[in-house]
């Protein structure tokens, strides 16, 4: 058994795009919190844009990591969920406007956040949760989502984005594949293919993608593609090599 940081660097390399692929059975929420915790701890200006959850949901989970994100001055939350699914009852700190397949409308609050808070590019991170919801709600099509990611990479040194895959969701699979071709690294979580193991959540695969960023020789173990077993805990995840766990058939 080992901790996640022994296999995955706490903060992605500069000028990187990290793709997180999950399923309904194996969501990647713990990876969001892993990156969020370390980015805020490192004083990175961190923008968190979600299309599926509320600030309170993430704040409760992050308290288990020993961090109150609501008090962090370098944390900027953008509520894309309310923009898509709920009428605006009162002005929020940063609220995405109504949109119909228009990139600037969807991501205007992000640009506003960067401009108003004088982000330093070298020390900036954006985490986008469930970007595929933009496609399934017809807010943006796949091509425009990819274009938006390219534009965001001009504003943030590190971009972390996730897509949730599933058998009934062929469009999400296609979107994930398209973003994967743009990414420097992909981290995917999927259920066990057969059998079960006590406490094991599923498989965690770390993969270098076509645009993998390298500056000199990286001495971290993350340079190697690998597949591990993992167990989600209240404050992170425990990781096991395949030989450490016996599956119960």
UniProtKB/Swiss-Prot annotation:
CDD domains recorded: Elp6 (cd19495)
Looking up InterPro entries in the UniProt record yields: ELP6, P-loop_NTPase
Record the organism.
Schizosaccharomyces pombe (strain 972 / ATCC 24843) (Fission yeast)
Function noted in UniProt: Component of the elongator complex which is required for multiple tRNA modifications, including mcm5U (5-methoxycarbonylmethyl uridine), mcm5s2U (5-methoxycarbonylmethyl-2-thiouridine), and ncm5U (5-carbamoylmethyl uridine). The elongator complex catalyzes formation of carboxymethyluridine in the wobble base at position 34 in tRNAs.
Q: Which GO terms describe its cellular component?
A: cytosol; elongator holoenzyme complex; nucleus
Family of the protein in this entry: Belongs to the ELP6 family.
Q: What is this protein called?
A: Elongator complex protein 6 homolog
How is the subunit organization of this protein annotated in UniProt?
Component of the elongator complex.
- In terms of domain of life, where is this protein from? Eukaryota
Its UniProt pathway annotation is:
tRNA modification; 5-methoxycarbonylmethyl-2-thiouridine-tRNA biosynthesis
Which PANTHER family does this entry report, sorted A to Z? Answer: ELONGATOR COMPLEX PROTEIN 6
Task: Identify one Pfam family in the record.
Answer: ELP6
Which keywords does UniProt give here? Cytoplasm, Nucleus, tRNA processing
One GO term under biological process is: regulation of cytoplasmic translational fidelity
Q: Where in the cell is it found?
A: Cytoplasm; Nucleus
């Amino acid at each position: 058994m080992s901790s996640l940081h022994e296999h995955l660097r706490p903060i992605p390399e500069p000028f990187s795009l990290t793709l997180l692929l999950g399923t309904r059975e194996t969501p990647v929420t713990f990876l969001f919190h892993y990156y969020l915790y370390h980015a805020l701890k490192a004083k990175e200006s961190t923008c968190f844009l979600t299309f599926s959850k509320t600030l309170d949901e993430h704040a409760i989970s992050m308290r288990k990591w020993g961090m109150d994100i609501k008090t962090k001055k370098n944390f900027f939350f953008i509520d894309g969920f309310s923009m898509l699914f709920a009428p605006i009852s009162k002005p929020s700190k940063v609220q995405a406007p109504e949109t119909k397949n228009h990139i600037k409308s969807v991501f205007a609050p992000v640009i506003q956040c960067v401009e108003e808070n004088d982000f330093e590019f070298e020390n900036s991170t954006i985490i986008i949760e469930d970007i595929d919801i933009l496609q399934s709600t017809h807010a943006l099509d796949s091509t425009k989502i990819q274009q938006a990611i390219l534009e965001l990479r001009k504003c943030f040194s590190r971009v972390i984005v996730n897509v949730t895959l599933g058998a009934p969701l062929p469009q999400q699979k296609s979107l994930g594949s398209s973003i994967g071709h743009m990414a420097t690294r992909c981290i995917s979580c999927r259920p066990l293919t057969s059998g079960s193991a006590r406490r094991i959540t599923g498989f965690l695969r770390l993969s270098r993608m076509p645009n993998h960023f390298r500056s000199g020789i990286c001495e971290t173990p993350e340079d190697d593609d690998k597949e591990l077993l993992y167990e989600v805990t209240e404050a992170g995840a425990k990781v096991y090599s395949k030989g450490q766990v016996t599956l119960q058939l």
